[in-house]
A protein has these predicted regions:
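Alpha-helical transmembrane segments of integral membrane proteins
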Residues: 1-22, 288-292, 321-348, 352, ...
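Alpha-helical transmembrane segments
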Residues: 31-60, 64-65, 372-382, 456-485, ...
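Small-residue-rich transmembrane alpha-helices
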Residues: 39-42, 319, 355-428, 466-470, ...
Length: 840
């Protein structure tokens, strides 16, 4: 322990003697450690951290593979009847439970509020072993027996605190959920947010209340509708693999049962074969399940790798500084060795300096990381739920930073410590620092470190170029919509107010008429499904006169739109007509008799070739059923999900023929600045019915930016990392060349005394810069080629081994190297030969 304190005192004295060195080293390390800490803060919360429940390692997620032969409402979804089969008959699980996330409108005395809701099975809390903070939570006996018979609500702890100010008398209070009276029965325990590490529901309701929560979409008994997500807790003795194996026989029994249903009995042999090839998947859910994780985890791992490269550049830079500093301290070290200090003791002192530098860098890096993490979070889109990801570092992040700091201190400190204590005592005590024998060895070490920095910087610059070009390509891919910066979109959910079917339609048409009559509005329309949100709903089609080939993709994306949709969106109608008042269906029979559709050009070309599709008929399903939908128009192609997904075949149907209309997405093309219209549009909806909330108001351009948030996150940080690495490499290169010029002052003076022109001296130094640059690039280019293949899935419109990106990275490094090398080269060429020959 005394030796430790001695090393610390020695290091602190050394730092005080050279504050500039200390500041530069700490800042370099802070940038590297801070970058890693910022990315790790999100990665840990989103990907690595276990759920805060008892024995999370025993939780699994269950879902069947495709094809479903029906409606699929999201990834890893299961039908509710299949969930019930698993819950009653699966032997590998203590309990099987399910949930589904959506949004509802809650009515209070002073207005309405749009909140996130999680529908859960009655055994949800029991299976997760989560209790109440106050009141009670759901139970199978009290909340999972009667269809539409459990109008109960459990508040999340966060929502209880933020909305009800932790009022304990809230239990027993009645609230309106989608205009339906329900009772608050409890508040879930603090610290429990749910199964999604990124978002938390505000309230939870029993899944038997689905007809209230999603009016018009009552499919609790529908096997062809996959919507809830199913989880389970393993029995002791079962693993994920053994549970998966034990569930396969039961799953195939369920498939045999489903195949007998009337809706599936007409399957062709091809589809029947695919149907029975389905498997049931069982995977660990110890960290929960998150769509946000699915979307951003790959990006975060890529960024973590790039942050690691930044840390290596920082370490190389600081190691180079330490080696240069060791040369100036060789006489001091030689004296200490001469009077009896052991080499191990001196190495311990020098390593302590490195560790203290890295710990100081980690402390500053933690401060920088919180600021950087907030910047990262600002790039993530709002989803309407309560965001759980935090920028503030917690104990896990703190431990990570300390571990990185210690590893970093040893990484960049060991080689300089070995180099500094390997001293020729006689030469060191006799000569001045500038003429020490160790200078040549030190220069070689520093040159190697600079070459490593060049190679690493090249990797980061190539990554920055690839990701920046990907974002540019995606943003400049034509959406098919005209002037999206002038197109305002917002969502209204009249169905949540439990309007009758005709009233929902008339409400939206009333709003549409008022919006169109507003000054500053050029055109307006609404649709059932939003565009450029990164998701959509596709369905198997049957087409008149087209015999599908085995394995042919017969899917098309569908949407229900109002009249005037094409004008509002700026999409051309290539043939036929728009929808109008004739295209409605107040009853299912009327809707089928008058069913019409407009298809996009891609659909028309695929199924009809050069023939006109106008007047032809299409239908839903695989092999049977009527072709009752008449095509009345063809629209130009436009994107549905987003640029990365490309153009799909699309079928548009009249919104007035939606079987169960609920929410609608409005699109308003404005002549004025869009932001000026926001309050006006909200007021218009409120004038029609103030109890119906408006949310998600933004321009379509902003929506596209949110859809590209993953690409923007990677590109932004890649550019920052690339620039940072280049600056650090430039500083390292400048330091090495300044060191070399100082060490070769006598040689340069002798050359000039013998008649060498200044240009020759200038070239002498710049040539060495080019050698360092060339060797670094020679190492970096093949590494960049290999590593870029691992991020190919994140690229768009640019090849992983894109030549022009590599050329641009080389040009940037060459320019930076020339500038960094020119200053010491110019100083060398300006040396006075007489002064140089006297230099020691």
């Amino acid at each position: 322990m005394p030796g430790l304190f001695s090393s610390v005192r020695y290091a602190l004295r050394a730092f005080r003697r050279n504050p500039l060195f200390t500041a530069v080293a700490v800042l370099s390390l802070a940038l590297g450690i801070g970058a890693n800490t910022a990315v790790f803060t999100l990665l840990d919360q989103l990907v690595l951290r276990l759920l805060p429940v008892k024995e999370p390692e025993r939780l699994v997620m269950i879902w069947p593979t495709e094809p479903n032969m029906g409606r699929n409402s999201g990834a890893r979804a299961t039908s509710y009847p299949m969930y019930q089969d698993f819950e009653r008959r699966a032997e590998a699980f203590e309990s099987v439970f399910c949930q589904f996330d959506t949004a509802v409108t809650i009515g209070f005395e002073n207005g309405t509020e749009h909140v996130n809701v999680e529908m859960v099975s009655g055994n949800y809390f029991q299976a997760l072993r989560v209790g109440p903070a106050i009141g009670r939570v759901f139970s199978p006996e009290a909340d999972d027996r009667i269809y539409k018979g459990h109008p109960n609500v459990v508040l999340s702890y966060r929502y209880w605190v933020s909305r009800f100010a932790s009022d304990p008398t809230v239990v027993g209070r009645k609230i309106l959920v989608n205009n339906y009276p329900m009772e608050i029965v409890g508040v879930s325990a603090p610290g429990f947010a749910g199964l999604d590490p990124a978002y938390s529901p505000d309230i939870r309701v029993p899944i038997q209340m689905k007809p209230v929560i999603t009016p018009g979409w009552d499919d609790l008994g529908e096997r062809r509708s996959q919507w809830p997500k199913v989880f389970a807790r393993l029995k002791p003795g079962y693993t994920v693999e053994s549970a998966r194996a034990s569930l396969q026989p039961l799953f195939h029994q369920i498939l045999q049962q489903e195949a007998q249903e009337e809706a599936l009995s007409g399957m062709s042999p091809y589809w029947r074969n695919l149907f029975f090839k389905r498997r049931v998947q069982v995977e660990t859910a110890a960290t929960g399940y998150s769509l946000t994780r699915e979307r951003y985890s790959t990006a975060l791992f890529v960024l973590m790798g790039m942050a690691g490269l930044i840390l290596l550049v920082s370490c190389s830079n600081v190691a180079s500084l330490l080696i240069a500093r060791a040369v100036t301290r060789q006489k001091e070290i030689a004296v200490r060795l001469a009077i009896g200090a052991g080499r191990k003791t001196l190495m311990g002192h020098l390593l302590m300096e490195s560790v203290l530098l890295s710990l100081a860098g980690a402390a500053l890096g933690l401060l920088l990381s919180e600021w950087a993490t907030r910047g990262l979070l600002s790039m993530l889109p709002e989803r309407g739920a309560r965001v759980l990801l935090r920028a503030e570092p917690d104990s896990r992040v703190l431990l990570f930073s300390i571990a990185v700091a210690l590893a970093t201190g040893l990484l960049f400190g060991l080689a300089p410590a070995l180099q500094a204590t390997k001293v020729d005592l006689f030469a060191a005590l006799k000569e001045a620092a500038g003429a020490l024998a160790g200078g040549g060895s030190s220069a070689r070490w520093r040159k190697m470190l600079v070459m490593a920095q060049v190679a690493l910087s090249f990797l980061l610059l190539v990554g920055a170029g690839l990701f920046a070009r990907t974002l540019f390509n995606l943003k400049n891919t034509g959406t098919g919509f005209e002037n999206i910066e002038r197109l305002v979109t917002f969502q209204v959910d009249a169905g949540a107010n439990r309007y009758a079917l005709p009233r929902v339609r008339s409400f939206y048409m009333d709003v549409l008429r008022e919006v169109r009559a507003t000054p500053g509005v050029k055109s307006a329309a609404f649709a059932w499904m939003p565009v450029l949100h990164g998701w959509g709903w596709d369905h198997t089609m049957r087409v008149e006169g087209h015999q599908g080939q085995q394995g042919e993709d017969m899917q098309a994306y569908m949407n229900f739109v109002s009249p005037g949709y094409w004008q509002a969106m700026g999409v051309s109608l290539l043939a036929g007509r728009d929808f109008d008042a004739r295209d409605r269906g107040d009853t299912e029979e009327e809707a089928m008799r008058s069913a019409v559709a407009i298809v996009n050009r891609d659909f028309a070309e695929h199924f009809f070739g050069n023939q006109s599709p106008i007047g032809r008929h299409i239908g839903w399903g695989d092999d049977s059923g009527p072709l009752y939908i008449r095509i009345v128009g063809v629209a130009e192609n436009s994107l549905f999900e987003g640029p990365r997904n490309g153009v799909h075949r699309q079928v548009f149907l009249p919104y007035l023929q939606v079987p169960n209309p609920t929410a609608a997405f409005f699109y308003v093309r404005t002549a004025a600045e869009p932001a000026v219209m926001y309050s006006t549009l909200r007021r218009i909806v409120g004038n029609v019915d103030r109890s119906v909330p408006v949310y998600g108001m933004k321009t379509l351009e902003k929506q596209l930016d949110e859809t590209l948030s993953t690409e923007r996150l990677i590109a932004s940080l890649a550019v920052v990392f690339g620039a940072l690495a280049t600056v650090l490499a430039a500083l390292g290169l400048y330091g090495v060349m300044a060191f070399v010029v100082t060490r070769r002052t006598k040689e340069i003076g002798l050359r000039m005394a013998l008649g060498a022109p200044r240009s020759e001296v200038l070239w002498l130094v710049l040539r060495e810069v080019l050698v360092l640059l060339g060797v670094g690039l020679a190492a970096g280019i093949p590494c960049a080629y290999l590593l870029s293949r691992y991020v190919s899935s994140q690229l768009f419109g640019v090849a992983p081994a894109d030549v022009w990106t590599g050329v641009a990275a080389i040009a940037v490094l060459a320019l930076v190297a020339a500038v960094a090398g020119f200053v010491p080269a110019r100083r060398a060429s300006a040396i006075d030969p007489i002064t140089a020959l006297r230099y020691e």
